[in-house]
Amino acid sequence: MLLRKVPGFVPASPWGLRLPQKFLFLLFLSGLVTLCFGALFLLPHSSRLKRLFLAPRTQQPGLEMVEEIAGLPRAREQEPPPNPAPAAPAPGKHDPSSRGRRKEWLRRTRPTGHREEEIVPFSFDFNAFRSRLRHPVLGTRAGESEEPQSRVRAQREKIKEMMQFAWQSYKRYAMGKNELRPLTKDGYEGNMFGGLSGATVIDSLDTLYLMELKEEFQEAKAWVEESFHLNVSGEASLFEVNIRYIGGLLSAFYLTGEEVFRIKAIKLGEKLLPAFNTPTGIPKGVVSFKRSWGWATAGSSSILAEFGSLHLEFLHLTELSGNQVFAEKVRNIRKVLRKIDKPFGLYPNFLSPVSGNWVQHHVSVGGLGDSFYEYLIKSWLMSAKTDMEAKNMYYEALEAIETYLLNVSPEGLTYIAEWRGGILDHKMGHLACFSGGMIALGAEDAKEEKRAHYRELAAQITKTCHESYARSDTKLGPEAFWFNSGKEAVATHLSESYYILRPEVVESYMYLWRQTHDPIYREWGWEVVMALEKHCRTEAGFSGIQDVYNSTPNHDNKQQSFFLAETLKALIGCVLLPRPARGTGISIFCSLKTTCSPWKTGCSTPRPTRSQ
């Protein structure tokens, strides 16, 4: 009888269906059965593999996790308070020092989510920070040549001119928009910033400053002061807003001490906090600024590279604001990742923020996974080498990557493959090419017997990525390149042949140059400059290209903000600074985050432990 109430549905009899209707119903049913049966082939073939990927259900993080983060004693373990309050003074006696110590202990042990107003207003002493810098932000170091050789000086000025041209084109045609479209000479907002504007402005701040483009920097600063508003109501990518906006603002503050950058960064960081309102504390990838929640219309999984690339920014937000909630959020992410089972020590790319279990069996050092590993080693360096947890996680992950993903092609090219449930895809993405620089960056702090090995490995991976550029007609690298069917370091599909002004390869050149002083990396960087000038420069800015194997490629009509923030900064990193004394080659760049922005090291944010 129910079927008779469906509009437009009239069965042949009160109790039956017409033959065509029966056929459609059976067709639907058979398709459903086929789909369910086919899904069985995607499941692990053994219970052992299932145990590797599907962690047993554990109690959802709640008060117990908050207590541990805040440094409170856990009741079930009956541990004494780390700093017990002093005994109460005898009646009638007044002990101001004891009362002061007790208040201090209460402040340390009270959960930060319910803290009362601080008695003393928080302030960050920028002048004290600046006085502790080991090297000047601009200019040369003591004992270094004021002027490099003429060829290097000309290269430096050329890259600065490229930055000026990219900025002036953006300012003329798209000022205030997120990115420039150079072919149509207009701006592009996109839908991943939740209504925020000016991504190129904020992403470019530190590059303009470091290149000593003073007029352009003042233009960017004025726009931030007057036009960068946070009263937006869209849905934004947590990852993109963090690395482009918050990262750019933090870098600008550390370089200049201008309060506008600090204040904007903190306020924007507060707007991202609802993304962490999940059962595990693993944030959703999309946050709704309108509803102040993290359950926007995105899918059910969180991506490793996204929730794993928040640590640096959020620790600095805590340091600059005095609000411990930022640090607590990212330390909770670390806690979840420490506890969960990892297949062969590898970190899959997708994690459920609800259950805390891995969702898929895909492991990649390229897209979806890349910056997680980068943030581990940089967290170690930025903590003035005190964050032992980050150090251990990084070297353990690197060992697993080398054991299960690293390959050498028949031509002798070293590459990092992708892993899908035990089966390797013999390809390497452009995003994975940052790993050469990352491994070089971490080689110094590896075990003594591994240091030379890691330096050689970094050089070999960087050479492979250079080959992906050298084997194209434009001398620019594809989005992904393969090692099969007799072809090596080339894209095999047109859909992977594009180049969107990405920085990862030149970042590795920069790190290897600063560490080894081998001029080959400077030469490779200059090859990229020439290729960008020939194939990506247009009348009104720089544009990505659709096919690197076409000597006259079509443009994609987009000047990415990271081209100014990362690619050009990494290129000038090879030639702008005078050649440093051997042994200090990468010190000035060791704190570059994923968007290649310089930050302070030795973050003084207190790190709560079980003993506090």
Q: Where are the predicted features?
A:
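Cytosolic juxtamembrane regulatory segments of membrane proteins
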Residues: 51-63
